[in-house]
């Protein structure tokens, strides 16, 4: 199953996340199909950038959103 979830980037105690499309069987930081955006919770206000067209495309072909991705993309 294809999922859209966060993969952790950044350094120790300074997390930064990519919003990626991947197979659900892959590890969190494993290989991914496409990167569609990023999320930075460490700055004020939080920065969320993603390609809405690509998100809509992947949802239309059956990709599931993780809970956290669903929450941050609905803002």
From Swiss-Prot:
Transmembrane segments: none annotated. Keywords: Ribonucleoprotein, Ribosomal protein. The keyword Ribosomal protein applies. Coiled coil: none annotated. One of its GO terms (molecular function) is structural constituent of ribosome. Belongs to the bacterial ribosomal protein bS16 family. This is Small ribosomal subunit protein bS16. It comes from Campylobacter lari (strain RM2100 / D67 / ATCC BAA-1060). The lineage of its organism: Bacteria, Pseudomonadati, Campylobacterota, Epsilonproteobacteria, Campylobacterales. The gene is rpsP.
């Amino acid at each position: 199953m294809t999922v859209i979830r966060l993969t952790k980037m950044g350094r120790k105690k300074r997390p930064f996340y990519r919003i990626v499309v991947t197979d659900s069987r892959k590890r969190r930081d494993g290989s991914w199909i496409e990167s569609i955006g990023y999320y930075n919770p460490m700055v004020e206000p939080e920065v969320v950038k993603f390609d809405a067209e690509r998100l809509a495309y992947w949802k239309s072909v059956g990709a599931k959103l993780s809970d956290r991705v669903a929450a941050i993309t609905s803002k």
